[in-house]
């Protein structure tokens, strides 16, 4: 396994997963240049992890641990989502999306509560802010057969939250379970059952995770049962009644 202190090897264009997104991406902490946004995000995780402070244990990370390792080992969070424009970290993808929309719309971080913050101000890691101009990116987009370029194929600065471990993609059942868990965490947080101070405490997150897992397992069992019986309305997994959340937490 590569040491966390080893220099980040720069890949050739042919080795990049998306060579069409090659451009100039600058690290705001050390001014090192990268040809791909994913390489810059990985560099930040490996070389500047000590810029993070965990809001759950109020401890600054050291350079020997990444934010993902810290959340997994110290707080039992198997997956977290880090914003590429400020390196704030959130417990669910939905929270990251809400935070990103606020940054893009108003320049403010919004009301979504992160589980870890960095020394970087919200939006300060956006390449147009660092470089003073939008990053130069070679699109290299391919024209679909018999049609024009799709608007959805436009290129923007990547905000990556994927782990670069090379793990196999999750199964359909695992992906569904993850969605149910994320929705449960979101519902618990949005229910305002806990105060802001409580959310920064480890014991609170242990309760949140246990409750979210229980809710996710219950919903998944119900969905499986309904598929087998092939009757009755489908269970709505996107919203979880608040009364069930309170029952699980209490």
Curated annotation (Swiss-Prot):
One of its GO terms (cellular component) is nucleus. It comes from Caenorhabditis elegans. One of its GO terms (molecular function) is DNA-binding transcription factor activity, RNA polymerase II-specific. Residues 239-250 have a biased composition (Basic and acidic residues). The keyword Repeat applies. Residues 126-177, 226-250 are annotated as: Disordered. InterPro entries: Znf_C2H2_sf, Znf_C2H2_type. The keyword S-adenosyl-L-methionine does not apply. It comes from the Eukaryota. PROSITE patterns: ZINC_FINGER_C2H2_1 (PS00028), ZINC_FINGER_C2H2_2 (PS50157). A zinc finger (C2H2-type) spans 25-48, 52-75, 81-104. This is Zinc finger protein lsy-27. One of its GO terms (biological process) is regulation of DNA-templated transcription. SUPFAM superfamilies: beta-beta-alpha zinc fingers. Involved in regulating left/right asymmetric differentiation of the gustatory ASE neurons. Plays a role in modulating expression of LIM/homeobox protein lim-6. The gene is lsy-27. Residues 148-165 have a biased composition (Low complexity). Keywords: Metal-binding, Repeat, Zinc, Zinc-finger.
